[in-house]
Design a protein with these regions (language model features):
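Bacterial N-terminal signal peptides
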Residues: 1-6
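His-enriched metal-coordination microenvironments in redox/metal-binding proteins
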Residues: 122-192, 199-219
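Aromatic- and Gly/Pro-enriched helix-to-coil junctions and flexible linker segments
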Residues: 9-133, 200-218
């Protein structure tokens, strides 16, 4: 009865937006969400309008709270590769679509649903890992940070303090979920001089590993 009532309410919601699933919203979902939200994926499918429409209000809440797509890293600390985070414009469009009645639009504009397969993880070039915290004995090119044993709901800050006192924020994870476990590869690897102290601010027993780029593969 609840689902029938919800669907009936949706059917009577006024349409007050020109944003549609077939033109704008499906493209955002396919690019940012569907890698998990597809048939057989890690979460319920959102690849069709009929699948996404009942979740419209939940989608609005999740994107406004920046809980979806799951990423973990606080925005603005550092640029990372493969960051699925929504842009401000994408958030605005998703919210506007939901608040405007979540219309479907003309099927002629609908893009092809992407295909997904269980691909092997992409391996970035790295010479090895350094367990943190640590004081560097020689200069290194930092390529990535991987959190270890960070509990659900906890936060972690990894910061490099260089010998001259300058500070580089490597990653800040907030309200972490172990299901999000990943390596945060820097878009631009960072040269850290000898004597740099890399600190980890996180609850025990959490730690982190710094991946170091191989010479000649800094980018």
């Amino acid at each position: 009865v609840g689902l029938i009532g919800a669907l009936a309410a949706q059917a009577h919601e006024p349409i007050t937006t020109k944003l549609t699933w077939t033109q704008e919203i499906s493209r955002i979902v396919y690019q940012r969400c569907a890698s998990c939200h597809h048939e057989g994926g890690a979460a319920f499918s959102l690849t069709t309008y009929d699948e996404a429409r009942p979740w419209a209000k939940a989608i609005r809440e999740e994107v406004l709270e920046r809980r979806m797509p799951p990423w973990g890293a606080v925005e603005g600390i550092r640029a990372y590769r493969d960051d699925p985070s929504l842009t401000a414009l994408e958030v605005e469009m998703l919210v506007g679509w939901v608040e405007g009645g979540a219309p479907e639009g003309d099927a002629v504009y609908l893009p092809r649903v992407p295909e997904f397969s269980a691909a092997a993880p992409v391996s970035m070039s790295a010479a090895g890992g350094i367990t943190l915290p640590v004081t560097l004995q020689k200069a290194v090119t930092a390529a990535a940070v991987t959190p270890r044993d960070l509990p659900d709901g906890a936060s972690m800050e990894v910061t490099a303090v260089e010998p001259d006192g300058s500070i580089e924020h490597l990653v800040w994870l907030r309200n972490y979920r172990q299901a999000w476990a990943r390596t945060y590869w820097f878009r631009d690897p960072l040269v850290l001089p000898a004597g740099t102290r890399i600190e980890v601010n996180a609850p025990a027993p959490a730690s982190a590993v710094l991946s170091v780029a191989r010479p000649g593969n800094e980018r």
